[in-house]
Amino acid sequence: MQHPSRMLLGTLFATVALFFVMETSLAQDVTTVAGGKETHKVLIDNADVRVLDVRLPPGQKIAMHSHPANVVYFVTDAKFKVTTPDGKTMERDSTAGQARWSDAVTHAIENVGTNEVHLVQTELKGAAAAAAK
């Protein structure tokens, strides 16, 4: 029979491993979730970056999804409602020509403005993402 401390350590390790597996499976790519498939066009996808052309009509909702560290350039003005995994919501406004940095994030978004939102999003991958941490 194993010593209780070894059993506890094994259980702890299994729990942590399960958490990471679940976290990875819950983090969905924006191009695969409801609303994202129709609104996100991949322009470039290589080992370093993925560049997305995003167009969201008024009222468009994008289901919960994740991004690695990224930069967003707003081609048009934008008014979003952002929902985090814990259910908290906030509104964000951006103006055409504005660029924003974001660390890795999981959220759902909705265009709550009156105009189509057009933005270009550059997601960092590989060494670029590691350097951003």
What are these regions (language model features)?
Residues 77, 104-127:
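Ligand-binding loop in jelly-roll beta-barrel domains
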Residues 45, 86-104:
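Short acidic-glycine-tyrosine-enriched beta hairpin
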Residues 25-27:
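Boundary at the C-terminal end of the N-terminal hydrophobic targeting segment
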